[in-house]
Amino acid sequence: MNNSEWANKNYYADLGVSSSASEDEIKKAYRKLARENHPDKNPGDKAAEDRFKKAAEAYDVLGDDKKRKEYDELKALLASGGIRGGFGSGGAGFPGGFRTSTGGFDTSDLFGGGQGGGFSTDGGLGDIFGGLFNRGAGSHQSARPTRGADVQTEITLSFVEAAKGTTIPVELTGDAPCNTCHGSGSKSGHPAKCGTCDGTGFTSENKGAFGFSAPCATCGGTGEIITDPCDNCHGRGTVRKSRSITVRIPTGVEDGQKVRLAGQGEAGPNGKPAGDLFVKVHVKKDDVFTRDGSNILITIPVSFSELALGGAISVPTLNKPVKLKLPAGTPDGRTLRVRGRGIEARDSTGDLLVTVQVSVPKNLDDNAAEALRAYAEAETNSGFDPRANWAGQNR
């Protein structure tokens, strides 16, 4: 992001506080947003990652008294019309910037001309803009290529692997640092400074009343040129390679989520940092388990006698089976809870929810049939009527 874009940010809104918020309120708001949207808590959630970054950027300014003062003064000046048009098009000395002179007032003075320098105007404008937009001469540096491309791949896991977490090898083919020149692209390992842009990565051009800056055509905006290209990578600093990396999948990952591995994407050009790797997870359906958040759901068949008389049954879990006690008279369809046998979350562990379902035998031998007839007779003699309280009894 160009520093000139800071003026178009609403940092108070990004933190959800008013412009009169105290230092403590700003700190609390930032911590809350950072905790809720942290990438470790929301693996693969791009929206949460964006909110996390916006909150961090806002707190970097509003959490610093000096920066906040500069920011507030700048926003007030823009709101009052002191600078027309805002900074949507940048300013002189910024990529895509402008400068023009009307009525003896040269707006290039406001931005330190085309050199990225400080302000020389009176009235405190240098104090307002100097801190925000001139963090050092040559602010074009921020527009240079800074990292390699991001990479996305996909994997498929079983339900149990996704619920418990696992590590899995992933095969990738992409740009990797050249071992010969150690990613520099140069035989000597040291690219030369571009003479066209003097290492800034940008050149300026005047067209009448306007001045424009653009990425340097000689170096492509990097500020460096390769005068002695590496024989192996031909000056790129990267070569195509196949590699295998081990990806750690966190517990409880859900179907469709993405896991981000910082710095595991393609290598950056000429020694620049690598991009990120995003692993999209697909989870196969399981014959036994389903899930509801961090809870695991299972339906298990039981006999009528087990429900009527009570007893203990063996129930599978993510690890080893456990014994579940059925109270006498448990109704068909009842769901019983086994605490702590679900999916581990950051602050707690879910439960195993077991629903019992009567399995009615299709064929009975003579002894079983006789026993059931005897039971039915005893049931009638005891006065038991399963439809006694049924709403449709008298219809």
UniProtKB/Swiss-Prot annotation:
It is found in: Cytoplasm. SUPFAM superfamilies: Chaperone J-domain, DnaJ/Hsp40 cysteine-rich domain, HSP40/DnaJ peptide-binding domain. Its cofactor is Zn(2+). Zn(2+) 2 binds at C194, C197, C216, C219. Zn(2+) 1 binds at C178, C181, C230, C233. CXXCXGXG motif repeats lie at residues 178-185, 194-201, 216-223, 230-237. CDD domains: DnaJ, DnaJ_C, DnaJ_zf. One of its GO terms (molecular function) is zinc ion binding. Its main location: cytoplasm. Binds 2 Zn(2+) ions per monomer. Keywords: Chaperone, Cytoplasm, DNA replication, Metal-binding, Repeat, Stress response, Zinc, Zinc-finger. A zinc finger (CR-type) spans 165-242. One of its GO terms (cellular component) is cytoplasm. InterPro entries: DnaJ, DnaJ_C, DnaJ_domain, DnaJ_domain_CS, HSP40/DnaJ_pept-bd, HSP_DnaJ_Cys-rich_dom, HSP_DnaJ_Cys-rich_dom_sf, J_dom_sf. GO terms for biological process: chaperone cofactor-dependent protein refolding; DNA replication; protein refolding; response to heat. Residues 10-75 form the J domain. Homodimer. HAMAP family: DnaJ. Participates actively in the response to hyperosmotic and heat shock by preventing the aggregation of stress-denatured proteins and by disaggregating proteins, also in an autonomous, DnaK-independent fashion. Unfolded proteins bind initially to DnaJ; upon interaction with the DnaJ-bound protein, DnaK hydrolyzes its bound ATP, resulting in the formation of a stable complex. GrpE releases ADP from DnaK; ATP binding to DnaK triggers the release of the substrate protein, thus completing the reaction cycle. PANTHER family: CHAPERONE PROTEIN DNAJ 1, DNAJ HOMOLOG 1, MITOCHONDRIAL-RELATED. Belongs to the DnaJ family. The J domain is necessary and sufficient to stimulate DnaK ATPase activity. Zinc center 1 plays an important role in the autonomous, DnaK-independent chaperone activity of DnaJ. Zinc center 2 is essential for interaction with DnaK and for DnaJ activity. This is Chaperone protein DnaJ 2.
